[in-house]
Design a protein with these regions (language model features):
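N-terminal helix-turn-helix DNA-binding module of bacterial transcription factors
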Residues: 1-60, 73, 205, 337
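Alpha-helical recognition/docking segments in bacterial nutrient-uptake
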Residues: 2-5, 61-168, 172, 239
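Short beta-strand segments enriched in small/hydrophobic residues
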Residues: 17-20, 55-70, 177-187
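Residue-level detector of anion-binding/catalytic polar loops
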Residues: 46, 86-91, 141, 176, ...
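Hinge/beta->alpha junction and helix N-cap segments in small-molecule ligand-binding domains
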Residues: 67-76, 95-103, 155-165, 181-231, ...
Length: 338
């Protein structure tokens, strides 16, 4: 097997220059980098990660901390992070964090602090001031996805605004009897997405003069949760809404399945709109608010690498970036039936 010394000898450079050329660290001309990289590839040389870590002080490993791995939104973000890290030559270490306080302390006191990760990406998790300071003191930058965290570079969508726009689309089609299928307000993640989306729904209904009782149904945020709620809410024709504003595409798809099971036409009898951009939504003709989920992972990786490269934000306004969300109109929404 070829060694670094073999590559350096063939390239006509010193061993240290060859190391810098392959690691991307230090002052080496572009021509030399290309020549050394080509020779290393030709000779089948693969740099030792341990040796590179000793030379650069970096592990080329970034941690992603998430509360879920099996929900569609989270798995899509994780896929986006992984693809971007592989493209940049980095490894991914994945930690699933529950609401167990002992587990959280172990994660921040040991795994993220003492283990060899260069940066941390927090997915829909609020990082406390003490946790931020602890990682910052060790030169481990943090990037957040899902909400604002003081002192941390974050990317998020405005859930209240998105839900308001979602609801306004159905109102513009003449709907007045709308119900929000949302997440349980008693069991929310750190950034209270469920509450934000319910507020946005009610903002739109109040502005249009359509506020009503029994406008909210708490559901499990899943396809089965949407289906079960749909079967309950849509079964009574005397009190049936003309539209459902769903907290996610998965819930919307479940509600659509319930409507079909009950013999209802979508959108003839019932209009349904979701949030996310789930690929099944396109196949089913679901109108939705597309939040470009996988791109969020790639954006977070790009920011983490920029911070590792020495970039810093000048103030808190620079640290929080609102991401675009686009209304995608498909077959599941239409004018209210007269």
């Amino acid at each position: 097997m070829a060694t670094l010394a073999d590559v350096a000898r063939k390239a006509g450079v010193s061993k240290s220059t060859a190391s810098r050329a392959l690691s991307g660290h230090g002052s080496v001309s572009l021509a030399t980098k290309k020549r050394v990289a080509a020779i290393a590839k030709e000779m089948g040389f693969v740099a030792s990660s341990a040796a590179e870590s000793l030379a650069t002080g970096r592990s080329k490993n970034i941690a992603l901390v998430t509360p879920f791995v099996n929900r569609w939104f989270y798995s899509e973000v994780i896929d986006g992070v992984e693809a971007a890290l592989i493209g940049a030559g980095y490894d991914l270490t994945l930690y699933r964090l529950t609401d167990n306080e002992e587990q959280r302390r172990a994660l921040f006191d040991y795994f993220l602090v003492r283990k060899g990760v260069d940066a941390v990406i927090a997915l829909t998790l609020y990082i406390t001031d003490d946790e931020v300071a602890r990682l910052d003191s060790l030169g481990k930058p943090i990037v957040g996805i899902g909400g604002k965290i003081p002192g941390v570079s974050t990317f998020f969508i405005d859930d209240r605004v998105v839900a308001r726009r979602q609801t306004e689309h159905l109102i513009s089609l003449g709907h007045t009897r709308l119900v929000h299928f949302g997440g349980d307000l008693e069991h929310q993640l750190d950034f209270e997405v469920h509450a934000g989306r319910l507020k946005g729904f009610r903002d739109a209904m109040e502005r249009a003069g359509h506020s009503r009782d029994n406008d909210f149904v708490a559901v499990d945020v899943s396809t089965s949760g949407g289906y079960e709620a749909g079967m309950r809410v849509l079964a009574d024709p005397t009190n049936r809404p003309t539209g459902i504003v769903a907290v996610s595409d998965e819930v919307a798809i479940g509600a659509m399945m319930a409507a079909y099971r009950l013999g209802l036409s979508v959108p003839g009898d019932l209009s349904i709109i979701g949030i996310d951009g789930h690929p099944l939504g396109e196949a089913l003709g679901l109108t939705t608010m597309v939040q470009h989920v996988s791109k969020q992972g790639a954006i977070a990786v790009s920011q983490a690498l920029a911070l590792l490269g020495g970039m810093s934000a000048s103030d808190d306004d620079d640290l929080a970036m609102e991401l675009p969300v686009d209304l995608k109109i498909r077959r599941s929404t239409g004018p209210v039936s007269v």
